[in-house]
């Protein structure tokens, strides 16, 4: 709230972080924005379809989200725009046929839109069941990784159930990834920055030093994963960590 000035037009916040899974207190931020007559936007790509979202309850004026984050087709997204109290009227990106309420002219991606709608329908139906399963599985993973020195990055409870970001002190995340890459797909950061060797700005913001940020790995659980695969992942990563620790101690 202290960052708001007379020149502040809009506040934009990520609802759920794609790297560590932490869920922001969007409701409180939205209330602060409206208290100061500032438009409130949230990037909810990681959240919609995975956690309950209520634009009225959360005081959201603008919300962007994507189909592929909920198993829909790539290349299609949506922008919620508040129509009243306050009415928000975005300027068009470009002009032509006037589609998308003159915000984004051009022929509509009908197959993508239909696929998006179906993905949303399925996600809403499966949300509670999936969150329960993923919460249990994430808890199992974290418990096992903590036994071998793993440390959780992010909030312990206010996070996406399918996202787990941990680090193992002294062991490079890239070394872990390279060791398991033929059997398991995990990453050292967000999918947007997998080729970036720079330290994660998200982890730096948590107060971690640059060296420690390079120890992190990110694991994502999916709808099609099985308990057998989870157990295989835990065993494989745990064995890899122990092997890398032994190798490091012998150098």
Task: Label each residue range with its predicted role.
Residues 1-251:
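Pyridoxal 5′-phosphate
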């Amino acid at each position: 709230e202290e960052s708001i000035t007379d020149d502040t037009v809009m506040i934009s916040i990520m609802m759920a972080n794609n790297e560590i899974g932490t869920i922001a207190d969007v409701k409180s931020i939205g209330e602060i924005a409206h208290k100061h007559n500032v438009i409130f936007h949230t990037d909810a790509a990681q959240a919609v379809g995975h956690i309950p979202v209520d634009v009225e309850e959360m005081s959201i004026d603008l919300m962007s989200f994507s189909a592929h984050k909920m198993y829909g087709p790539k290349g299609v997204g949506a922008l919620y725009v508040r129509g009243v109290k306050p009415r928000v009227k975005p300027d068009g990106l470009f002009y032509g046929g006037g589609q998308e309420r003159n915000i984004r002219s051009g022929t509509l991606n009908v197959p993508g839109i239909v696929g998006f709608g179906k993905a949303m329908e399925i996600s809403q139906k499966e949300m509670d069941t999936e969150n329960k399963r993923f919460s249990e599985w994430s808890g199992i993973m974290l418990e096992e990784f903590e036994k071998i020195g793993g440390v959780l990055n992010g909030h312990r409870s206010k996070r996406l159930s399918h996202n787990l970001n941990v680090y193992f002190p002294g062991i490079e995340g890239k070394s872990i990834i390279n060791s398991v890459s033929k059997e398991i797909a995990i990453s050292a950061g967000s999918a947007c920055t997998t080729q970036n060797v720079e330290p994660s700005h998200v982890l730096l913001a948590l107060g971690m030093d640059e060296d420690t940020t390079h120890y992190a790995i990110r694991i994502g659980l999916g709808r099609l994963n099985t308990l057998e695969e989870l157990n295989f992942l835990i065993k494989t990563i745990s064995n890899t960590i122990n092997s890398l620790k032994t190798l490091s101690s012998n150098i």
